[in-house]
Amino acid sequence: MAQRTRLGDILKPLNSEYGKVAPGWGTTPLMGVFMALFLVFLLIILQIYNSSLILEGFEVDWTALGF
């Protein structure tokens, strides 16, 4: 049998909804939108790193980072 602790008693309300699932899609479309935006962000960073995205007046010198 599990031992009761003060921390467990404090955290118990956070786990009271365990096993309950909201009907329908819930916030899945919103999560998809944020995942797509994050993908665009990562692609922009990758293009800047590969110098395939040229920004006017913005020089990237990776040797200045000290690696």
UniProtKB/Swiss-Prot annotation:
It comes from the Bacteria. Keywords: Membrane, Photosynthesis, Photosystem II, Thylakoid, Transmembrane, Transmembrane helix. The chain crosses the membrane at residues 29-49. It is found in: Cellular thylakoid membrane. It holds the Pfam family PsbH. GO terms for molecular function: phosphate ion binding. The keyword Transmembrane helix applies. InterPro entries: PSII_PsbH (IPR001056), PSII_PsbH_sf (IPR036863). Its main location: membrane. It is a single-pass membrane protein. One of its GO terms (cellular component) is photosystem II. GO terms for biological process: photosynthesis; protein stabilization. One of the components of the core complex of photosystem II (PSII), required for its stability and/or assembly. PSII is a light-driven water:plastoquinone oxidoreductase that uses light energy to abstract electrons from H(2)O, generating O(2) and a proton gradient subsequently used for ATP formation. It consists of a core antenna complex that captures photons, and an electron transfer chain that converts photonic excitation into a charge separation. Belongs to the PsbH family. PSII is composed of 1 copy each of membrane proteins PsbA, PsbB, PsbC, PsbD, PsbE, PsbF, PsbH, PsbI, PsbJ, PsbK, PsbL, PsbM, PsbT, PsbX, PsbY, PsbZ, Psb30/Ycf12, peripheral proteins PsbO, CyanoQ (PsbQ), PsbU, PsbV and a large number of cofactors. It forms dimeric complexes. This is Photosystem II reaction center protein H. It comes from Picosynechococcus sp. (strain ATCC 27264 / PCC 7002 / PR-6). The lineage of its organism: Bacteria, Bacillati, Cyanobacteriota, Cyanophyceae, Oscillatoriophycideae.
